[in-house]
Amino acid sequence: MNQYDLNLILNPNISAEQVQTEKDYIENAVRNAGAEISNLDDLGNRRLAYQVGKDREGYYLMYTIKASGNPETAIASSLRLRDNVRRVLVVKDRPEWKTKKA
């Protein structure tokens, strides 16, 4: 099984109920792609490095998922159709990127 990082930026003006609805949809999309969620980091509203549409802020969600095969396109394409999703990035996680060699 490969490990992937799924990073999302949502509309910063959504309510807590809408955030929960989006999280449920994301979990279903990940499961439908044959993957499982191993970790979720809910970072909340943060300032963006550059303006996306009319927004200078975004609601950040960072998932760590495990899957066999290549679920990137299936997950990203289904999530990009959501109105509250501003950006989607699915990256294959590699352990050597997280450790610094001396």
UniProtKB/Swiss-Prot annotation:
Gene Ontology CC annotation, any one: cytoplasm
Gene Ontology molecular functions: small ribosomal subunit rRNA binding; structural constituent of ribosome
InterPro entries: Ribosomal_bS6, Ribosomal_bS6_sf, Ribosomal_S6_plastid/chlpt, Transl_elong_EF1B/ribsomal_bS6
Entry keyword set: Ribonucleoprotein, Ribosomal protein, RNA-binding, rRNA-binding
Superkingdom in the source lineage: Bacteria
Tagged with keyword Chloroplast: no
Gene3D superfamilies attached to this UniProt entry: 3.30.70.60
GO biological process, one term: translation
Pfam families per record: Ribosomal_S6 (PF01250)
Entry keyword annotation includes Lipid metabolism: no
NCBIfam families named in the record: S6
Family: Belongs to the bacterial ribosomal protein bS6 family.
Role: Binds together with bS18 to 16S ribosomal RNA.
PANTHER family attached to this UniProt entry: MITOCHONDRIAL 28S RIBOSOMAL PROTEIN S6, SMALL RIBOSOMAL SUBUNIT PROTEIN BS6M
Stated name of the protein: Small ribosomal subunit protein bS6
Lineage, top ranks: Bacteria, Thermotogati, Deinococcota, Deinococci, Deinococcales
